[in-house]
Amino acid sequence: MSRETGAVCRMCRRSGDKLFLKGDKCVTKCVFEKRPKPPGPQLGRPRRLSDRGQQLRQKQSIRWSYGMTERQFRRFFGLANAQPGVTGDNMMILLERRLDNVLFRLGFGTSRAQARQIVMHGHILVNGQKTDIPSYLIKEGQEITVRETSKATAYFKTLAENIEAKAIPGWLSLDRKTLSGKVISLPNAGDIDARFDAQTVVEYYSR
């Protein structure tokens, strides 16, 4: 299954929740707030979702939020399931460790989709080595920096001026002057987005 490439606002409407897939535009121009119902014809009262339907909706919401294909998402579930501990928490921690997500958390992109493009275009170094794989899993102690040649571009010049307002999670640190971040520690269950119920994903894939 390929990555979703249609109107991302439809994903929010299908999930029944605001997923912030378009970054700042989700604050100023949110289609979901105007049209929260699912896309398509509205025929009478909405049907009540079955347990399986609720599990699917939650799984899709998490997958869309992190911008992953079904195959990629299923692989991450398999990695989480092979680890000791709570599978749902393991999976969310792995998702948070993705390089594109770390850039998003640091404020280098207003959305995970934008952060993914930054990685794929070769602007990012991890411990001094160019890394252009968005799904790369960061490790404790690693440093994420912007290439010196990239800092001269208009995007990163603007970013350096505006990044002050971004709140950084406790497991990361940010040097705003050098546009670099460091992984102080790996994220834990307490850092997981409270909107997501990863246990429903475990139940979905366990059937």
UniProtKB/Swiss-Prot annotation:
Claim: tRNA-binding is one of the keywords in the record: no
Region (Disordered) residue spans: 35-54
GO CC, alphabetical: small ribosomal subunit
UniProt-listed InterPro entries: Ribosomal_uS4, Ribosomal_uS4_bac-type, Ribosomal_uS4_CS, Ribosomal_uS4_N, S4_RNA-bd, S4_RNA-bd_sf
A Gene Ontology molecular function term of the record: rRNA binding
Keyword set includes Membrane: no
Residues covered by the S4 RNA-binding domain: 97-163
Pfam families in alphabetical order: Ribosomal_S4, S4
Keywords per UniProt: Ribonucleoprotein, Ribosomal protein, RNA-binding, rRNA-binding
Swiss-Prot/TrEMBL GO biological process terms: ribosomal small subunit biogenesis; translation
NCBIfam families (alphabetical): PRK05327.1 (NF003717), rpsD_bact (TIGR01017)
Function statement: One of the primary rRNA binding proteins, it binds directly to 16S rRNA where it nucleates assembly of the body of the 30S subunit.
Assembly notes: Part of the 30S ribosomal subunit. Contacts protein S5. The interaction surface between S4 and S5 is involved in control of translational fidelity.
Family: Belongs to the universal ribosomal protein uS4 family.
Protein name from the UniProt record: Small ribosomal subunit protein uS4
Organism: Dehalococcoides mccartyi (strain CBDB1)
Species classification: Bacteria, Bacillati, Chloroflexota, Dehalococcoidia, Dehalococcoidales
Gene, per the UniProt record: rpsD
